[in-house]
Curated annotation (Swiss-Prot):
The lineage of its organism: Eukaryota, Metazoa, Chordata, Craniata, Vertebrata. It comes from the Eukaryota. It is found in: Secreted. Expressed by the venom gland. This is Bradykinin-potentiating peptide 5.
């Protein structure tokens, strides 16, 4: 998982 903006969407 990577942090970001917007945050990653977990499917």
């Amino acid at each position: 998982e990577e942090g970001g903006s917007p945050p990653p969407v977990v499917i």
